[in-house]
Each structure stands twice: as structure tokens, then as C-alpha cells.
């Protein structure tokens, strides 16, 4: 509760919409609007087929807090221009079909989950949202062949992979933590369409990606930058290894109440770029341990 109170105070939040079970986690000092479930709200709302709304690229769409390497969170303003650029670039790499249905098991409070929802909304494709992760239900949905896209962290895919016997998956975005080579091998044998991905809240998730099935000889890399994204190695050593910097329309302008970054984001990650333009990560954010996409210190 104290962490939530600090974050709400920093962002000057004056009112909060929340479900019943979250009330005890919230400070008494803020006005709250309680609901039983999202379904109960949406079932009573009349909506039009189209929306005559204009979103300016510079307008903030959402503010997401990151658990930074110092342990002190930072607030990232994600703007509509970033999101639009990301969706268009991601679609160029991953493609789009009328049958697309993205299974979302990652949390919406994390950029990996939110990006799935907004990609699907922008593309006009389906998304299936589970209230919580349930391995049996996920496997049932995969084998029903109604799902053809997923975003997962390696820990979850390691649990699922042995039980996947048939599917119509065309994309499995995989990232957020170290990916064991044994998992890549097992997925390759089943022709599971793994796309390794590298990104962060500051870039609205996926920034670098590639298909392991298309480039098996590059399996140690995290892929190539999305269209419009540039990756450069700052202060490289004799082997070309240095700090990874990102620039492009998907990169934030700066943290809230912090100095702007002028379009150049130092990820604090260490790596290099090979002769074919594939990016390799050697050290993630000062030896940070990541579990389930969340930071552990």
C-alpha cells in the first residue's frame, strides 16, 4: 500500500477506479470509484461502432511506472505518436491477418500486456484476455486453434512447451528474461514460431525482434531493430561491445519530472551489433534478475 500511495502522490492522482478486492491496498487519502467487475460496467454502456476522436501524437496516452535499476520507480509518459509508430513497425515485421487472435496472459499494468491490447485495437484484430494465468486454460485455448498469437516470458513457455501437441500459432513473442537455449531447441523441433524480442517500457515494449525459425543461425541474438528504430553501441571496446542506445519514434521523450533525453535512450544494457545488423545482449541492466517480466533486486 505504501508503494502505491507514493506512486499516486508523485503523479498527482486525484481519483482512482478500482475493483472491490483492491480497496485494502489503497490509501484513504484518495477518492475512489469502486466497481464489481469490468463486465458489469461494460454491459451497461452503449457504444457506437466508430469513434470520432482525435489523438495528437504529442498527447500522453498512459503513464507507466518502471521499477528502475536503483529500485526507485520512474514514471514513463507513453504518447500516442510512440504507440502509433510501434504498432505500424511491429505489423511490418509480424504481419497481420483477419484471423489474428492474440492470447494475453501478461498483466495490463506491464507494458508487454498493454502493448498487446493496443496493437490489437489499432489493427482491428481480436484479443483474448484471461483474468489470470491458468496453464490448463492456456493450453486448451492453444489447442482449440482459435489463438494464433501469444506473448510470453520464457518461464511460462518452459511450462507450456512439453504439452503443446497441435496449434495454429503464427507468432510467439518471447522476451522479458533470459531465454535458455534448451527452450529454443525444443520449440524449434515443434516448429513453434518463436520471435525473440527486446524492449522496455520506455520504447513501448518491442524494439528489436526476429523469427528464430527464419534465422536459426542468429538464435543467440535478440534480432534486428523494428523499422524506424535505430540501435547504436556507445563507447565500444576493441570487440565492438558497449552500452546499447536506442533512438526512433517509439522512444519516450523523457521521464516525468526528469530531464528530457533528446531522443537518445541509454538502456544501461551491454551488447554489440554483428555484421548483419543483429543485436546481441551480453549483460542486462547491471546484473538485474528478472522473473516473470518483473524486476527483482
Residue map of PLM features:
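Gly/Ser/Thr-rich phosphate-binding loop
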Residues: 148-152, 158-217, 230
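ATP-dependent adenylate-forming carboxylate-activation enzymes
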Residues: 1-6, 20-22, 105, 125-145, ...
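Conserved AMP-binding A3 loop
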Residues: 61-88
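Conserved pre-ATP/AMP-binding loop-to-beta segment of ANL
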Residues: 47-65, 72, 95-101
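Conserved AMP-binding/adenylation subdomain of ANL enzymes
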Residues: 84-101, 109-149
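Conserved ATP-binding/catalytic segment of the ANL
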Residues: 239-297
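Active-site loops of AMP-binding adenylate-forming
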Residues: 80, 200-219, 248-252, 258-260
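Structural core segment of the AMP-binding/adenylate-forming
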Residues: 1-44, 51
Amino acid at each position: 500500500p505504501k508503494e502505491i500511495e507514493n506512486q499516486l502522490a508523485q503523479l498527482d492522482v486525484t481519483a482512482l477506479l478500482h475493483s472491490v478486492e483492491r480497496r485494502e491496498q489503497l490509501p484513504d487519502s484518495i477518492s475512489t470509484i469502486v466497481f464489481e467487475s469490468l463486465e458489469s460496467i461494460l454491459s451497461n454502456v452503449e457504444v457506437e461502432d466508430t469513434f470520432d476522436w482525435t489523438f495528437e501524437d504529442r498527447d500522453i496516452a498512459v503513464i507507466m511506472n518502471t521499477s528502475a535499476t536503483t529500485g526507485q520507480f520512474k514514471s514513463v509518459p507513453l504518447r500516442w505518436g510512440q504507440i502509433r509508430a510501434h504498432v505500424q513497425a511491429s505489423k511490418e515485421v509480424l504481419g497481420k491477418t483477419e484471423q489474428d487472435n492474440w492470447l494475453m496472459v501478461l498483466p495490463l499494468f506491464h507494458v508487454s500486456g498493454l502493448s498487446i491490447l493496443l496493437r490489437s485495437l489499432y489493427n482491428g484484430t481480436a484479443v483474448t484476455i484471461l483474468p489470470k494465468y491458468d496453464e490448463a486454460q492456456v493450453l486448451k485455448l492453444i489447442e482449440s486453434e482459435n489463438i494464433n498469437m501469444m506473448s510470453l516470458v520464457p518461464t511460462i513457455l518452459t511450462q507450456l512447451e512439453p504439452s503443446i501437441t497441435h496449434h495454429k500459432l503464427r507468432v510467439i513473442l518471447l522476451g522479458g528474461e533470459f531465454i535458455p537455449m534448451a527452450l529454443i531447441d525444443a520449440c524449434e523441433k515443434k516448429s513453434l514460431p518463436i520471435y525473440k524480442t527486446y524492449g522496455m517500457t520506455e520504447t513501448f515494449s518491442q524494439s528489436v525482434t526476429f523469427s528464430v525459425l527464419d534465422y536459426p543461425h542468429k538464435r543467440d541474438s535478440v534480432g534486428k531493430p523494428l523499422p524506424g528504430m535505430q540501435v547504436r553501441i556507445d563507447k565500444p571496446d576493441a570487440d565492438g561491445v558497449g552500452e546499447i542506445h536506442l533512438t526512433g519514434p517509439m522512444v519516450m521523450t523523457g521521464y516525468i519530472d526528469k530531464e528530457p533525453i533528446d531522443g537518445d535512450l541509454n538502456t544501461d544494457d551491454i551488447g554489440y551489433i554483428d555484421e548483419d545488423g543483429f543485436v546481441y545482449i551480453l549483460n542486462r541492466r547491471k546484473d538485474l534478475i528478472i522473473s516473470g517480466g518483473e524486476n527483482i533486486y
